[in-house]
């Protein structure tokens, strides 16, 4: 199939961008909702480990190996932003601000992670624009 779109929430949001970066003929559109868009950098591996542990005792190293494994960089949208720009992939990136709402309640880990994720989304937007990107919507 060609010309499809892929959208993901949280960890699947960064995966949606990665799928579009590496398979531009199949995915011409990609959407990311509240995803950490620089997972291999800084606190990324630790925060992913925290979230995965909180979600059921999973380990981040079971996903892409130890944090210095090349798989982390390969699956990092920030490091693949040039591919998205070169492919002219249409992207939509959304992220909340970490403030509690009726939907999310007052969940402290969620508020912390959403605030951290928002910072990564803003860095991704800056990198995308600096790379010459012009086919994105940011919310």
Curated annotation (Swiss-Prot):
Keywords: Acyltransferase, Cell wall, Cytoplasm, Secreted, Transferase. The keyword Secreted applies. It is an enzyme of class 2 (transferase). Its main location: secreted. Homodimer. The active site is at residues 10, 114. Substrate binds at residues 10, 38, 116-119, 123. Its EC number is 2.3.1.122, 2.3.1.20. It is found in: Secreted, Cell wall; Cytoplasm. Pfam families: Esterase. GO terms for molecular function: diacylglycerol O-acyltransferase activity; trehalose O-mycolyltransferase activity. This is Diacylglycerol acyltransferase/mycolyltransferase Ag85A. InterPro entries: AB_hydrolase_fold, Esterase-like. The keyword Secreted applies. It catalyses: an acyl-CoA + a 1,2-diacyl-sn-glycerol = a triacyl-sn-glycerol + CoA; 2 alpha,alpha'-trehalose 6-mycolate = alpha,alpha'-trehalose 6,6'-bismycolate + alpha,alpha-trehalose. Gene3D superfamilies: alpha/beta hydrolase. GO terms for cellular component: cytoplasm; extracellular region. The antigen 85 proteins (FbpA, FbpB, FbpC) are responsible for the high affinity of mycobacteria for fibronectin, a large adhesive glycoprotein, which facilitates the attachment of M.tuberculosis to murine alveolar macrophages (AMs). They also help to maintain the integrity of the cell wall by catalyzing the transfer of mycolic acids to cell wall arabinogalactan, and through the synthesis of alpha,alpha-trehalose dimycolate (TDM, cord factor). Belongs to the mycobacterial A85 antigen family.
């Amino acid at each position: 199939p060609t010309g499809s779109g892929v959208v993901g929430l949280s960890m699947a949001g960064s995966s949606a961008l990665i799928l579009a970066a590496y398979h531009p003929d199949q995915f011409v559109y990609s959407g990311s909702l509240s995803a950490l868009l620089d997972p291999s950098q800084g606190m990324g591996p630790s925060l992913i480990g925290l979230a995965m542990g909180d979600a059921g005792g999973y380990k981040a190293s079971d996903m892409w190996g130890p944090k210095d494994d090349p798989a982390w960089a390969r699956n990092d949208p920030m490091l693949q932003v040039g591919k998205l720009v070169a492919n002219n992939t249409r992207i939509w990136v959304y992220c909340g601000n970490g403030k509690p709402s009726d939907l999310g309640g007052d969940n402290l880990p969620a508020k912390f992670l959403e605030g951290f994720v928002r910072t990564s989304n803003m860095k991704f937007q800056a990198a995308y624009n600096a790379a010459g990107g012009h086919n994105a919507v940011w919310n």
